[in-house]
């Protein structure tokens, strides 16, 4: 059985180049300014993934608690993470009010409407989406890191969630790590939560790479994907997921850059009757910041690397 898995995996890796899933330009202008296309699949193989963390506890509809675009360039070993603040006030296609919080798009129309809303407002073409709810997140973390993921826990966080740990560095398992990425009752509020989400995402990437860093361990990759699919929803087929994970192993990640949208000083806090408290963003300024971030060679700013 192991030999069969190795043969299948070798065929998968040999048959999928780094550009197999990038058929279109990845950054599409939403303003009159033209961006020079430097993202052809035969040159860089750029892939854009929409990562969604939903607040679902089993309900048929839920809001997106985390919205992250991960742009991956395997041959260059670069990952760029863009966190879109869920309270950003944007135009949602088909919404009776026109504008609402970004996470309302997911509540109304799931992954597809959220992808369209992001494309219409920010000009980012998403290749694939992956969503995971609270229970799925906890189970997935326990699957890839049975001993937990080490993070720095504050006293405020411990008090807020009644966590059974001491302040400082702790290896948190699934359910406790979920509290870490959801916490927002300090001076940083949602902005701190976004930073922690990006931090944990990078550490998950490291766990995956360590788990499958040897050829022998790759034999377990198909079974791992089967188990992982029990905890996430994705528009990707199993073979596509295997190909992406294999690239993470065979193309070492050299740089991870991160950006938060809206960028600093590009929004104001507003309140609307139909949506409550929102971040009313300067859309043009954020589009330009986003384009600049994606088109610059990595590392864009080492200060933001984890």
Q: Which residue stretches match the model-derived regions?
A:
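Sec-dependent N-terminal signal peptides of Gram-positive bacterial secreted proteins and lipoproteins
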Residues: 1-20
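Non-catalytic, solvent-exposed segments at the cell envelope interface
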Residues: 17-306
